[in-house]
């Protein structure tokens, strides 16, 4: 009987030890970086640098509530340019970046939480453009503008379309109107929102060539326990209708 008691006690201690290991260090803080990518993430004042409560948007509101529900500390900074932010998320332990497309070639570079929302990939042209496209291959003959470091630009380059990239995606709207490019490869609704910010309206979609899901990408150093807690919190938010409610504020 004493032997059985020891075995039972030992099993209980193992369970308790596992529970302790699963607890997140209360002092641990995830360093979150984002960019101006409306309506998902944006600085309240429209600038290229903001922190904490001075950042809003669909993904920002979801991520803030997700971390709150999971009981995990975070800091949040909006910076520029995206290529630099992405590199920091890739290389810095304890960092995370959002929102970014979860592509097969990126799968093993991060730990992922999401999806936070959809992002259709489109080719936009001026309202009076005569360009008609049925495939990406047909776009090869045109000058295409894209956003440096973005999944869309990377995908186009991989397929040999050689996009002309810029550090601010809204600059492509102006380049389009000035005739410096024929097409703008961007996300929808983000592209139209950015275009309006620089006074460009009436752009037309000549091709919709992909539909991606946007995620929070965490550095691989972030523990699996934290990733699981965040994913569980997001799943619960979606189940409760909170994600839809947040999207309704902006769209």
Regions found by a protein language model. Give the residues of each.
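Short helices/loops that flank or line small-molecule/ion binding pockets
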Residues: 68-70, 78-79, 83-95, 111, ...
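Extracytoplasmic small-molecule ligand-binding "clamshell" domains
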Residues: 24-101, 108, 146
């Amino acid at each position: 009987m004493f032997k059985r008691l020891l075995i039972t006690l030992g099993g209980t201690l193992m369970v308790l030890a596992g529970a302790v290991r699963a607890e997140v260090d209360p002092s641990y803080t995830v360093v979150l970086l984002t960019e101006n990518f409306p309506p998902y993430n944006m600085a309240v004042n429209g600038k290229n640098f903001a922190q904490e409560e001075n950042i809003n948007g669909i993904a920002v509101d979801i991520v803030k509530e997700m971390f709150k529900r999971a009981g995990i500390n975070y800091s949040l900074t909006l910076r520029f340019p995206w290529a630099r932010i992405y590199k920091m998320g890739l290389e810095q332990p304890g960092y995370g970046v959002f929102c970014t497309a979860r592509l097969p070639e990126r799968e093993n570079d991060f730990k992922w939480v999401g999806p936070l929302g959809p992002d259709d990939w489109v080719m936009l042209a001026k309202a009076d453009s005569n360009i008609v496209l049925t495939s990406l291959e047909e776009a090869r003959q045109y000058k295409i503008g894209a956003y440096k470091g973005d999944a869309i630009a990377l995908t186009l380059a991989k397929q040999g379309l050689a996009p002309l990239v810029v550090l601010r995606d809204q600059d492509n709207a102006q380049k389009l109107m000035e005739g410096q490019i024929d097409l703008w490869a961007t996300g929808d609704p983000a592209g139209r929102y950015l275009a309006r910010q620089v006074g460009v309206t009436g752009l037309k979609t000549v091709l919709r060539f992909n539909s991606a899901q946007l995620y929070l990408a965490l550095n691989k150093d972030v523990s699996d326990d934290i990733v699981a807690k965040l994913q569980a919190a997001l799943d619960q938010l979606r189940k409760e209708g909170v994600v839809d409610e947040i999207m309704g504020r902006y769209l």
